[in-house]
A protein has these predicted regions:
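A short glycine-rich, His/Asp/Glu-containing loop-to-beta-strand
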Residues: 125-128
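Charged, amphipathic alpha-helical segments and their flanking helix caps
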Residues: 2-121, 132-212
Length: 212
């Protein structure tokens, strides 16, 4: 399912309304959009990614100075959160993240130490796992155990679509062959369905689904 936007960030810039000011405004808009588009901000609780949504231009007179006009623009970025979650006593989401972290040279959000401000380049692949849904399992519960079915979304992000797609293929093949991965208590998570859609956005939606 598509996630909601977690918030927005707006940057306002303005220059004196003349030929040089207008040129400076156009250049500043390009620089700021490039600087913040696709940037990740991380603290101890969550990671946020910024995605440019729109730029709105304006022209107005400075209050109290009727002969001074400025031209400017407001750049709006959507913020998507990648928060830490813990699903105890059995954490399928964290266990899949750990499995990925241990088997591939990728950056796993909330499983890897990250800088406060960073942006994946063409060589780096970034992965985030989250719980999409949970239902009672198809097997009947017993006194020894209770079964649940989890849908886990995997977000795969990179500056290179080729590298992101290659990792997705490797991940799907690995899980398809193993048919399981180890949970945090040592028990297996049995995978019964894998899905990959190129129509889904890796930041908003997560284009890989692991069901089991």
């Amino acid at each position: 399912s598509e996630r909601k936007v977690s918030g927005t960030m707006e940057i306002a810039i303005a220059y004196l309304f003349n030929n040089q000011g207008y040129k400076n405004l156009l250049e500043a808009k390009k620089i700021l959009k490039k600087a913040f588009e696709g940037v990740f901000l991380t603290d101890e609780d969550t990671t946020i990614s910024l995605v440019w949504r729109k730029s709105e231009s304006f022209q107005e007179t400075i209050e109290g100075q009727m002969d001074v006009e400025v031209c400017g623009s407001v750049l709006t970025f959507d913020a998507y959160a990648f928060p830490k979650h813990s699903y105890l006593p059995l954490d399928a989401v964290g266990s899949l993240a750990k499995h990925i972290d241990e088997n591939w040279n990728v950056t796993v959000i909330n499983n890897t130490e990250l800088d406060e401000i960073w942006k994946p380049d063409d060589e780096e692949v970034v992965v985030y796992t989250r719980l999409d849904s949970m239902q009672p399992g198809t097997f009947p519960s017993t006194y020894a155990c209770t079964w649940f079915t989890n849908n886990i979304k995997v977000h795969v992000i990179s500056g290179s679509d080729v590298n992101a797609d290659q990792f997705v293929m490797n991940l799907l093949q690995d899980i398809q062959e193993r048919e399981r991965f180890v949970m945090n208590d040592g028990s297996p998570f049995f995978v019964n369905q894998l899905a990959y859609s190129t129509k889904l956005d890796p930041l908003k939606d997560g284009h890989v689904t692991v069901r089991g």
